[in-house]
Amino acid sequence: MSQQVIIFDTTLRDGEQALQASLSAKEKLQIALALERMGVDVMEVGFPVSSPGDFESVQTIARTIKNSRVCALARCVEKDIDVAAQALKVADAFRIHTFIATSPMHIATKLRSTLDEVIERAVYMVKRARNYTDDVEFSCEDAGRTPVDDLARVVEAAINAGARTINIPDTVGYTMPFEFAGIISGLYERVPNIDKAIISVHTHDDLGIAVGNSLAAVHAGARQVEGAMNGIGERAGNCALEEVIMAIKVRKDIMNVHTNINHHEIWRTSQTVSQICNMPIPANKAIVGSGAFAHSSGIHQDGVLKNRENYEIMTPESIGLNQIQLNLTSRSGRAAVKHRMEEMGYKDTDYNMDHLYDAFLKLADKKGQVFDYDLEALAFINKQQEEPEHFRLDYFSVQSGSSDIATASVKLACGEEIKAEAANGNGPVDAIYQAINRLTGYDVELVKYDLNAKGQGKDALGQVDIVVNHHGRRFHGVGLATDIVESSAKAMVHVLNNIWRAAEVEKELQRKAQNKENNKETV
């Protein structure tokens, strides 16, 4: 019987640190639900002490997720651990993940401390975390550059203090696979109480070998792998979980371990993370890239036609990628659309059927035929924009030509009021953005604009993703339409709604803080 490798996802904590715009609480919950559906064992969803917004997000996810263990990060600082526990306590069970640097460089230059003092602090903080939960994980930051004898001392002390998972991070992506395996083997040889904890690894991709390091560590005895979907994360990214999961599945003959992941959900989860985080997946990305199962060489094509196993070590279907595309038309009823969504793996709670069917009919009238990729794009936008909107695009028109200055006229619902404005710009998109910004009075700077076709052919849906800077904060917006200018307008309206909602959340947090202060004064 093979042993289980625990899959620890840190997309919402370490992965989010790489994003140009922070995710909203709703977007984080959307990703958390996708990860739960995929079957991750543990999800690290934030760093609660970092901001009131992160605290609220962690609390919301902890209250909602039932089938994965929710975890929050805390430094070896009393307040960090106490705040993490406060955010997580709404969950039936939770994990606190605390960490401190252990390498000579970090101890000397960052902490300005000694190894003995680091061990003392680690022990105290692990014990403090154990006051809140028996599921405590301890990480030795920069373990890859920590002498193994020093590392063994820290690990033994942390286990004695009550840590049930010990994480060995290659924080800067420095070690080679054979080195990293040697570190894990060295700990098993040196730490007498190592059988009382699960050894975990957390690798970074600075040298392009994060997945290789994680797999080498598993082969050496590690039984938890930490990473992020699509490998997102700081600098060159984290270990790509989908790659580790499928490597373990495909090479079970030599790995002799398994995961409890529903691998048929990998494709959908990957797409969800990519779209919400506004991080496109490279075509040649292993497992989930659009070219991962493509064969262009004539020799390869011939071999695949004769037997797929000639050139495919796994199938698209094994990760939930259905390559058989069915089409629907405006004559297709609600039942047909609902049935197709179910066949693609969607549940009723994943989308609003009324809104989706309305958008489907409008698209079918324009395109004639609506394909699976169209439905998935509509469902994604439907989910992104289902919250109450303060701003709504009512009407727009654009006049533009090769030698004319572009002029846009826009009508926008701002709360209960309909406003109209016209503006010139350097092209139709800029003209529309000038008009919208005049209407709302928001001072935003466009820092990123991406256009991607969702589907094939000249009538494909165009998805526009934008990132804007507003008073030092970055916000993401998305729009979808067969018309690129309309997609662009919708993306700007979406981003302005996100800014408005963020301001409302900030007001609510301030109100709660003021009420708490008033209650203290009353007592």
UniProtKB/Swiss-Prot annotation:
Its cofactor is Mn(2+). Its EC number is 2.3.3.13. InterPro entries: 2-IPM_HCS-like (IPR050073), 2-isopropylmalate_synth_dimer (IPR013709), AIPM/Hcit_synth_CS (IPR002034), Aldolase_TIM (IPR013785), LeuA/HCS_post-cat (IPR054691), LeuA_allosteric_dom_sf (IPR036230), LeuA_bact_synth (IPR005671), PYR_CT (IPR000891). Pfam families: HCS_D2, HMGL-like, LeuA_dimer. Pathway: Amino-acid biosynthesis; L-leucine biosynthesis; L-leucine from 3-methyl-2-oxobutanoate: step 1/4. Gene3D superfamilies: 1.10.238.260, 3.30.160.270, Aldolase class I. It is found in: Cytoplasm. It catalyses: 3-methyl-2-oxobutanoate + acetyl-CoA + H2O = (2S)-2-isopropylmalate + CoA + H(+). GO terms for cellular component: cytosol. One of its GO terms (molecular function) is acetyl-CoA C-acetyltransferase activity. Residues 392-523 are annotated as: Regulatory domain. Keywords: Amino-acid biosynthesis, Branched-chain amino acid biosynthesis, Cytoplasm, Leucine biosynthesis, Manganese, Metal-binding, Transferase. One of its GO terms (biological process) is L-leucine biosynthetic process. Its main location: cytoplasm. Signal peptide: none annotated. Residues 5-267 form the Pyruvate carboxyltransferase domain. Mn(2+) binds at residues 14, 202, 204, 238. Catalyzes the condensation of the acetyl group of acetyl-CoA with 3-methyl-2-oxobutanoate (2-ketoisovalerate) to form 3-carboxy-3-hydroxy-4-methylpentanoate (2-isopropylmalate). Belongs to the alpha-IPM synthase/homocitrate synthase family. LeuA type 1 subfamily. PANTHER family: 2-ISOPROPYLMALATE SYNTHASE 1, CHLOROPLASTIC-RELATED (PTHR10277:SF9), HOMOCITRATE SYNTHASE-RELATED (PTHR10277). Homodimer. This is 2-isopropylmalate synthase. It comes from Salmonella agona (strain SL483).
